[in-house]
């Protein structure tokens, strides 16, 4: 596999030092001393799995159940009397879980840290990180916007940085990237149970863990190692087979599912993907699918370990994690058992999917691109006649793979004499992604097409931009 990321570049751009990971993560050393390893505890998880099996009557377990039950603080209590009847647990009883890792974004971390400071603890009980991405407004461009945000939000950033230093929490400075892309690149690993103070935290599940979005009070539970309670979700199985056409991406899978299931179709469920079609999808594509599971109300999503996950771990400097995960997968930890029963199953033939778009107003309004023009011309159509702007970015569309595809399209359009007709903004998911875009001339291809590169942050996706609607 080619070197996917530019990992050693170290320079000053956009007004801040970029490139090397530690340049942004100012307190990596402190966090590493308290929590010396980010390697999942596979031996312990496998041992607990062997203890769980008799408690559920030896019935086949879904991957979601394996990852949850191996994180139970007391399986004998939480699974008492369950036997082989899955309905006695799924959707029926609360699970008391131990959390492996916590991630917080700058807008929601403030109250969580203030509450944690009253607990009398000298450091966080689990590995944790804070990411400055939500409070950076997109007005002019990367450098000007970052400098403005550093000034207007200086008190917030100073508080977050000092609290992280005091309590051994890793702090990612403004400009380092979007929380979910950074977590995927650095922390997510197969088999982990993670929490994040953002609804799109399930993005990390694309690497085979269970990542769940929570509020500040739940974050304090994790920081203090208080048992985290979750009503055991039901499991919605999605069987993938076939192969996507060249114009489709993994995003079309979740857009299709949103149209089929609606915004409430996943409520109370973990969406668990299985089937041969999974082997054709990249890890960043799986992250996109799990990220947008939030749009159907899912608790999170689950994926069995695939070689694509191992390649991504290797490309981001985590070869040891990949090797350990492969061994855990062979031992049966990172996939569902044969003959497992789901509460509901949806079948998706990847070869039959078409490029599509969802919206406006609701993320379950799915329209195939081939039908879009005719649909837009209908009198009752909610789609606008003109576009106000375009964004290539957000936590679900800002990976290196996303950017390279868009750059290729931009170059094809330029070759045909086509020009951008509306404002086009680009927000790389992380400084690692942006540096690699620069190295591979992807950033140049997009800016030559008329795009404006913004800071590595949420920006327009969460309304942090100068919006000028068509009248």
Where are these regions (language model features)?
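Fe-S-dependent hydro-lyases/dehydratases of central metabolism
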Residues: 25-471
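N-terminal mitochondrial targeting presequence
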Residues: 1-32
């Amino acid at each position: 596999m080619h070197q996917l990321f530019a990992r050693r570049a170290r320079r000053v751009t956009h007004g801040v030092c970029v490139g090397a990971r530690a340049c942004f993560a100012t307190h990596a050393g402190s966090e590493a001393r308290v929590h010396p390893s980010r390697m999942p505890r596979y031996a312990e998880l496998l041992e607990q799995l062997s203890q769980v099996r008799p408690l559920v009557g030896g019935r086949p377990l879904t991957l979601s159940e394996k990852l949850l039950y191996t994180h139970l603080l007391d399986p004998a209590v939480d699974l008492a009397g369950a036997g082989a009847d899955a309905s006695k647990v799924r959707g029926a009883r609360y699970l008391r879980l131990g959390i492996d890792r916590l991630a917080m974004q700058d807008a929601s971390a403030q109250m969580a840290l203030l509450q944690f400071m009253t607990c009398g603890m000298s450091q966080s009980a689990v590995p944790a990180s804070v990411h400055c991405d939500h409070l950076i407004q997109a007005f002019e461009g990367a450098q000007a916007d970052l400098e403005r945000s550093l000034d207007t939000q200086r008190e917030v950033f100073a508080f977050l940085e000092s609290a992280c230093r005091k309590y051994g929490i890793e702090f990612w400075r403004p400009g380092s990237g979007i929380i979910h892309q950074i977590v995927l690149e650095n922390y997510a690993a197969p088999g982990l149970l993670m929490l994040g103070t953002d609804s799109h935290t399930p993005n990390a599940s694309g690497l085979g863990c269970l990542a769940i979005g929570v509020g500040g009070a739940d974050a304090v539970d994790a920081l203090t190692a208080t048992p985290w309670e979750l009503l055991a979700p039901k499991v919605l199985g999605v069987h993938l087979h076939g192969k996507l056409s060249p114009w489709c991406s993994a995003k079309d899978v979740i857009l299709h599912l949103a149209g089929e299931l609606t915004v409430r179709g996943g409520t109370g469920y973990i969406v668990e993907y299985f089937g041969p079609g999974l082997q054709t999808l990249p890890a960043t594509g799986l992250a996109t699918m799990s990220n947008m599971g939030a749009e159907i109300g899912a608790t999170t999503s689950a994926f069995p370990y695939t070689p694509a996950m191992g390649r991504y771990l290797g490309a981001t400097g985590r070869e040891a994690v990949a090797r350990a995960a492969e061994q855990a997968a062979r031992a049966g930890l990172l996939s569902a058992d044969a003959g497992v029963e789901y509460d509901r199953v949806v079948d998706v033939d990847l070869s039959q999917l078409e490029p599509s778009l969802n919206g406006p107003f609701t993320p379950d309004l799915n329209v195939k691109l081939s039908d879009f023009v005719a649909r837009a011309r209908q009198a009752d159509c909610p789609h606008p006649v003109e576009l106000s702007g375009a964004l290539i970015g957000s936590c679900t569309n800002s990976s290196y793979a996303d950017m390279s595809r868009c750059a290729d399209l931009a170059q094809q359009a330029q070759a045909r004499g086509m020009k951008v007709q509306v404002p086009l903004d680009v927000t790389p998911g992380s400084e690692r992604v942006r540096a690699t875009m620069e190295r591979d001339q992807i950033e140049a291809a997009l800016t030559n097409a008329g795009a404006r590169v913004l800071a590595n942050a949420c920006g327009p996706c969460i309304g942090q931009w100068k919006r000028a609607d068509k009248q």
